Amino acid sequence: RALMSTKKETVLRDLDLPALQAFGWNKDDQHQLEAWRNLRTPSDRGEAGLASCLARVIAVERTGLTVAPHLNAPDGHVPVSGRWFRGDEETRPTIGDWVVIDAQTGMLLDMLPRRSVIKRVNPLGALQLIAANVDAALIVTSCNADFSLERLERYLSVVLEANITPVLVLTKIDLAEDPSVFIEALSQRFPEIAQVAVDALSEGAAAALAPWCTQGQTIALLGSSGVGKSTLVNALSGAAVQQTAA
């Protein structure tokens, strides 16, 4: 099933850039595509040529992946064969991966090399992938009893290890009697890390985070439950795309 040289160019030549850019495609991903083409021989890529397309993983389920854009499947579902789950955890697709899909069968053919990946060791000691190809990570905490410098250090360690830009986001400043106490604690402990204090329900929240949310940038939100991550997602999206706590 080796591809002819004319087919090698098809994935690159037929990119629907506007559709991909809507899901975070940027020049760094373009470089990863070039690296994929250079690293994979025709036999390695199987049929990933003339009848294939690129998409991004937005969810991982037991039955397969949900990807976007996926013109041939309205629900974005991509079946995944067993071979993808027989190898190491890091070889399996995760949220944020750019994948090559057979445009005719809708099957997963290959993945582009990752430029970053957030991962952790779960309570059972197994490696767990969180997200791939992330540009900036918003590490969210709040002005209340959840505030923990030690927890923030753990998140920072994960993000910096992945070579991702960290941003410390302090939420619920409108509910704190004296938010400056929390702001000062962050500044003293993490002087070299970008920090933003916001009321996630205010109109200014999106503007404060805009430098890390430009077109083509992919951000991840990390933080414990209840710190306002869903509220921030809604603020950045300009719509209620995530349900928030009462």
What label would you give each PLM region?
Residues 150-160:
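Histidine-anchored nucleotide/phosphate-binding helix
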Residues 230, 235:
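Walker A/P-loop
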